[in-house]
Amino acid sequence: MMRLLLSIWLLGCTLSFPLLADEAPDLAARIRYQDRITGNDGIARESVWQEKWLRVGNQVWSQRLIPLPLARAYHATHDATPGHKHFTHQMAARWVTLDDGGDLQLRYADAWHNQLVEEVPPEEYGQVAFKPDWERIRYLVNPALLQEMTRLDEQAPEQARWYEKREGKQRTRILWSSRWQLPLVVESASLDGYRSYRMEVTLKPLPRQLPWQQLDSYQTLDLRDFFD
């Protein structure tokens, strides 16, 4: 399955996409991911998760939706463990900004502990599994990928189109919205049906107050403050 996910990222790394709008509209969304693989033992294993996602200007905020009882239990165990505390980036909201100079700033907001990790240096991106691909962060997939794909004449929402690419033993499909400048659906699957991945975007109203405007009371930290 990792090969499927990597193919989506690699196919569109450096190309340009002429239909891409100069300004991407501000959006709020809920994203659902589904990852399924059938192993050699015949057992199908499926992972399903969701996240809140927000794009405003050159800022993108994403936060995995974790049921409160599970989050409470995790933090109770983690915080009660003696010794140095490590940063669990999966439990925090990720905040990525592109500055005027074209540089990315990566931050994490931990609402449970009221902490803002405002400095994640590039050499530590691997610690939080972060890939500094702004096109992919801003648009969920690199729009250049569409140039490698075939446009399909299938039913789709207004100002949206299905695209498909078959390569080797797998197929990738993207439902791209030119209006919203992002994919509404991404599907990738092996042709034998034993591996599949799906991402589905549901648009939501923009919040009245942006999440990064609510961090004044947060303690400011550097990611390296969590290192042993």
Each PLM stretch: what is its role?
Residues 45-47, 136-151, 194-197:
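A short, amphipathic edge element
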Residues 31-38, 62-67, 79-86, 108, ...:
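Short beta-strand segments that buttress and anchor functional surface loops
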Residues 22-24, 146, 156-160, 167-172, ...:
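Non-transmembrane domains of secretory- and envelope-associated proteins
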Residues 1-4:
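Positively charged n-region of N-terminal signal peptides that target proteins for export
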